[in-house]
Amino acid sequence: AVCKGAGAGDVLLANRTPAKAQALADELGCACGTNEEVAGICDFIFLGVKPQMMADMLDELTPTLEARAESRPFVLVTMAAGLSMQQIRQMAGSGYPIIRMMPNTPVALGDGMIQYCSDDVEPEKMAEWLTAMAPAGRLDAVPESLIDAASAVSGCGPAWAYQFIEALADGGVAAGLPRAKAQEYAAQMLLGSARMVLETGKHPGELKDAVCSPGGSTIQGVRLLEERAFRGAVTDAVLAAFEKTKDLGKK
């Protein structure tokens, strides 16, 4: 969503596999180049690699970054789970201005959630970055100490939401609905329910109670989910993801 909202000359893509970079550039209407070219000319350098690959990539880019640091300042933007801003700076070999962000996959449609923190970024550059990111969805500044927890909820959460949609659709099929209809109903229900939470400001428990009529069908489903430890399972999933994210930063 961000790339599609930017001008054709404002985004330069790079990938260790040139064919992938070219295909994505063609899809988004952007230019593509090498990692060194990105490091040499871009104002915001997005580091979109896995944590275990970050050190090697930055080691290759260090000479380019050092050469331009004084004449043309830049901001490093990291999306690597578990790696702190301090770790990224150590890998890059200097205390460059840095933004750490945790997006999720719905940013592709402009309905994502991005938590971010920054260090030593000039206010005008921060404002520029926020404007560029706005088409991706909601943005929220958080202390770096909360980034990993935020990632466990909104970064990993879409996978669990898809599991829930699939499970609801399975139930609908078991009850006689065609698969396509059951999936559509489940997805739209989750979308609308999320909007109810965000736009009404009401507690999810209050909204849940409003659907549960005394002696009705919904409360029976709620009762069964409670018996099967639905809440506990979801909470444990978040904590498991949180612990794994922290482990990534230790390796």
Task: Give the positions of each predicted feature.
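Rossmann-like NAD(P)(H) cofactor-binding subdomain of soluble oxidoreductases
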Residues: 18, 23, 27-28, 37-114
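NAD(P)-dependent Rossmann-like dehydrogenase/reductase catalytic/cofactor-binding core
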Residues: 187-251
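N-terminal Rossmann-fold cofactor-binding loop
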Residues: 12-18
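Short pre-catalytic strand/loop immediately N-terminal to key active-site residues, enriched for Gly-Thr
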Residues: 98-99, 147-152, 204-209
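Short acidic-hydrophobic, aromatic-tinged amphipathic segments that line or gate anion-handling sites
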Residues: 31-37, 140-142
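Conserved S-adenosyl-L-methionine
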Residues: 3-10, 95-97
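Internal alpha-helical scaffold of NAD(P)-dependent oxidoreductase catalytic cores
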Residues: 87-97, 113-150, 161-199
